[in-house]
């Protein structure tokens, strides 16, 4: 069964190989890698949209292993993906064994890309007949068609396969994969549940089921599935441990999420992701000092100039901002900007720190630069600037900016309305009650957080306003 979410690339052993390869590129040296290692690296780059690096890895593989079948097939597919169909055909023709099973699959794939569906079907028909209509062959064909987004053909082959081999486990796996890829999640879940009836101790089935629930944001169900996989495979269940941690994180159970991230870090101490997320759990739990320790440890594990390094610098900047150490915050955001100098969110962060210091003119200049740089997607920048103005008590300016974004699809109402509420409350706008009602209905947790109030389940708008008035009167009396 195919892993539709490419969890292999999250595993530390792959990350180590990738790091060794990238170190080789940086140093200009040459090192020996197995052809399989290089094709996996190429697949990783391709999955992340970096076709140039993918092909470079394949070229290096063919330099070391010029007749390697897997590398040649992958190279042909890479050319195909990049729109060079003729080159892909030419590479396929150079392969010595034209009757190799994987070469036939490649030829079918090339025919599909050339919209020669009947030729592709003939190749696949000859294969299924030559292999005696075996269930395993059907499964491979269905997976190929699904991967090439030939939904109708895949469904026809699946129907035929299940008619010949009803309740054959490998075909049920292909069916589940196909349904998941087509986002027919209810049917995919049903298939995985049937597979689990056959093999309740399959960590793979539990993991795949968890992934679907995670995609549907059904985090409680995802956690149940991932924890079954973990119970079966223990610490070797890297993906399931990571996904369970992420699921707990997404429902705000940072204590439980932290336990899973710590478990990952203990087993895979050289991997940065658990350390970074351990820091984020502490940030969200209000423990900035512990978060700083984790982020500092994480810095020691990342490559200079990497995206991960920039993310850590930005989090450290935010921590020092909350500690009102704004010069220190600026120093860390400057480090992040060395890596991504055109990142408008980082630029706005720097402007925010200057505004916190009362450097209004300088911050305004930086904000305007950010808006100019991000003119095609200005709404997100405006929102961040509006929030910065609000947090620095420039309520009228903040309200003017945020009000421009009402009913703008680029900014989700769940993000916008709590901040609008606070502006309207401070400015005593007549629309406050209506805005508060909307905010409580779509983003209750953030609304209470913005007003620094403990959440009260089922509280009416009038009751919350009464609480706010009581607090306001108490503060005025003091």
Regions from the language model: what does each represent?
Residues 43, 77, 109, 143, ...:
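Residue-level recognition of tetratricopeptide repeat
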Residues 74, 106, 140, 174, ...:
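Canonical tetratricopeptide repeat
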Residues 14, 51, 85, 117, ...:
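TPR-repeat structural position
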Residues 97-99, 298-300, 403-410, 421-447:
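TPR/TPR-like (Sel1-like) alpha-helical repeat modules
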Residues 47, 81, 113-114, 147, ...:
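Register position in tetratricopeptide repeats
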Residues 36, 70, 102, 136, ...:
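Start-of-helix register in tetratricopeptide repeats
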């Amino acid at each position: 069964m195919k892993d539709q979410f490419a969890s292999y690339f999250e595993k530390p052993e792959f990350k180590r190989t990738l790091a060794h390869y990238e170190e080789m590129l940086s140093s200009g040296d040459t090192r020996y890698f197995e052809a399989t290692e290089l094709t996996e690296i190429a697949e990783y780059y391709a999955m992340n949209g970096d076709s140039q690096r993918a092909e470079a890895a394949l070229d290096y593989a063919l330099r070391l292993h010029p007749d390697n079948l897997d590398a040649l097939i992958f190279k042909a597919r890479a050319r195909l993906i990049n729109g060079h169909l003729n080159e892909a055909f030419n590479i396929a023709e150079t392969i010595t064994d034209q009757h190799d099973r994987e070469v036939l699959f490649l030829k079918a794939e090339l025919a599909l890309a050339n919209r020669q569906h009947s030729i592709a079907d003939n190749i696949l028909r000859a294969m299924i007949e030559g292999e005696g209509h075996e269930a395993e062959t059907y499964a491979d064909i269905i997976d190929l068609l699904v991967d090439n987004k030939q939904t109708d053909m895949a469904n026809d082959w699946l129907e035929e396969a299940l008619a010949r081999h009803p309740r054959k486990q490998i075909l049920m796996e292909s069916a589940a994969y196909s349904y998941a890829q087509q986002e027919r999640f209810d049917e995919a879940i049903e298939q995985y549940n049937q597979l689990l009836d056959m093999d309740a101790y399959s960590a793979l089935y539990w993991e795949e089921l968890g992934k679907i629930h995670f995609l549907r944001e059904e985090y409680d169900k995802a956690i149940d599935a991932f924890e079954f996989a973990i119970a079966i495979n223990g610490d070797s269940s890297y993906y399931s441990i990571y996904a369970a941690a992420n699921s707990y994180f997404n429902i705000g159970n940072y204590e439980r999420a932290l336990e899973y991230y710590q478990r990952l870090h203990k087993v895979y101490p050289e991997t940065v992701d658990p350390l970074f997320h351990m820091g984020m759990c502490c940030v969200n739990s209000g423990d900035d000092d512990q978060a700083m320790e984790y982020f500092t440890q994480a810095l020691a594990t990342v490559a200079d100039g990497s995206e991960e390094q920039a993310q850590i610098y930005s989090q450290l900047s935010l921590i020092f901002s909350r500690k009102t150490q704004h010069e220190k915050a600026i120093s860390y955001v400057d480090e992040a900007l060395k890596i991504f100098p055109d990142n408008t969110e980082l630029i706005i962060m720097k402007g925010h720190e200057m505004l916190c210091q009362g450097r209004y003119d300088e911050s305004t200049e930086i904000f305007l630069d950010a808006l100019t740089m991000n003119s095609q997607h200005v709404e997100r920048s405006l929102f961040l600037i509006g929030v910065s103005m609000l947090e620095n008590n420039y309520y009228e300016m903040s309200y003017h900016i945020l009000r421009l974004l009402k009913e703008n699809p680029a900014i989700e109402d769940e993000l916008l309305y709590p901040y609008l509420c606070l502006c309207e409350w401070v400015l005593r706008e007549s629309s406050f009650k209506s805005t508060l009602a909307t905010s409580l209905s779509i983003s209750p947790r953030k609304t209470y957080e913005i007003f620094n109030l403990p959440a009260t389940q089922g509280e009416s708008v009038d009751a919350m306003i009464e609480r706010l008035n009581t607090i306001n009167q108490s503060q005025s009396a003091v």
